Amino acid sequence: IAYEKIIHQFDEVFTISKFEQNYTKEKFNKGKFIPVFHGNKEFQLLSEKGKFALYHGDLRTSDNRKVVSFLIDVFKEIDYPFVIASSTREDWVKSKIQNFKHIKFIKLKDFDHLKDLFENAHINISWSFQESGTKLKIINALFNSRFSIINKNVIDDKLISNLCIKVSDKSELIKAINKFKNQPFIASDEYVNTLEYYLNNQLNAEKILKQIFS
């Protein structure tokens, strides 16, 4: 990788995933972890119950399409509304869900549209079949919605993953959805503090500035 040839010239390397931090520490003896930056300022306090489970993503990527196929297969076995939201591949999704009245595709317009979906979702599902660090979509769901169910590939930051419901396969995912679909969501003080302090954009930017100018 081209940039690795000049890393030795840098005083420090900032990383936004634990995987990257471990890699740069091991290979270059540099690497300071800073949580991913995002556009959220504060946790949105919503009612305790939403109306559906939500998956959103860019369906131009093969991994996300594989996830959608997997989740459709999951919700064939669950009597609960499921919304797939994306700005792409509408016809492809609709061809897969045409026989399932409780599964719906919504074409995303913009982030405000996504926030409206977050506001009404009771369960957010983030899944990947490949290791990907911490996905921004999870941060957005945690700030703006209710329950988040994940598998291990979408978060490598323990503090953030502790805010989510972690499962590893189809069977565990079905059990989790059935368990939480009727359970009220009540955010603990620890939940809110992790979002508003640990993931605070301004505080994390100040950490970078302090490192640069100290």
Where are these regions (language model features)?
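A charged, aromatic-enriched C-terminal amphipathic alpha-helix characteristic of glycosyltransferases
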Residues: 44, 182-214
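Short acidic alpha-helix that forms the nucleotide-activated donor recognition element
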Residues: 5-8, 110-122, 143
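Short glycine/proline-enriched, acidic/aromatic patches that form the donor-sugar handling elements
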Residues: 114-115, 131-133, 153-162
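Acidic donor-binding loop of glycosyltransferase active sites
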Residues: 11, 118-133, 146-147
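Conserved catalytic-core segment of nucleotide-activated headgroup transferases in glycan assembly
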Residues: 35-98, 104-115, 119, 169
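Short hydrophobic beta-strand element within catalytic cores of glycosyltransferases
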Residues: 140-143, 147-151
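Conserved acidic donor-binding segment of nucleotide-sugar-dependent glycosyltransferases
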Residues: 163-171, 178-184
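Membrane-proximal helix-turn-helix segments that form the acceptor-binding/catalytic region
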Residues: 1-13
